[in-house]
């Protein structure tokens, strides 16, 4: 799980990875016979019994640096990824982060560029809010309106949804399923919640090099069992 690909120097959250560190991390995958792909591609491959050697790569929040900084590195390594975007904030910034530096978000042109390069465009909701705190109508808006908006923009209904802040419960997962998505990405889903609408992910940071990547991969695989 990635977020912004840029200079991480002033990021208090540790969610920014420099392009050269992303390059190192993808080289680490390649050296072990692993290829980064979108979540939709990974799930289809697993369903067909051919998921071996594939790793799902996701980029949350839809930062504008994805097209300029992440895409060239992904292409260099023959990888694809899923970009989770916020249709209600296109061309805006990460206003939900009170302490971090303001970072621009993708606009419509950026999304089309990413999609044309083979990136899976998926929904992160409309505005990056904790969905578990919303009433029924607001939750439906975040899930259904964001899907309709992205469908119109890309000409293709998004298959995936990513829960802002990674927070999900049974009600939210059910709303995502009802909206027509094929899967939902969390971080560490609560106990008792599993399946395609509560997919666990592992955060990758600037600090992650060979030893840490190995430990995180083992931890992630163990957690999926």
Positions of predicted regions on the chain:
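Acidic (Asp/Glu)-rich catalytic clusters
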Residues: 30-31, 72-78, 104-123, 177
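C-terminal active-site subregion of NodB/CE4 polysaccharide deacetylases
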Residues: 1-58, 64-67, 133-225
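Structural detector of well-ordered beta-strand residues that form the stable sheet scaffold
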Residues: 82-84, 122, 182-185
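A short, conserved beta-to-alpha structural element at the edge of catalytic cores
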Residues: 78-100
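A short, flexible beta-alpha/helix-coil linker loop
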Residues: 5-8, 88-89, 127-130
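Histidine-centered catalytic micro-motifs
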Residues: 4, 121-128, 164
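Surface-exposed cleft-lining segments at the edges of enzyme active sites
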Residues: 92-102, 129-136
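Generic enzyme active-site microenvironment
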Residues: 58-59, 122
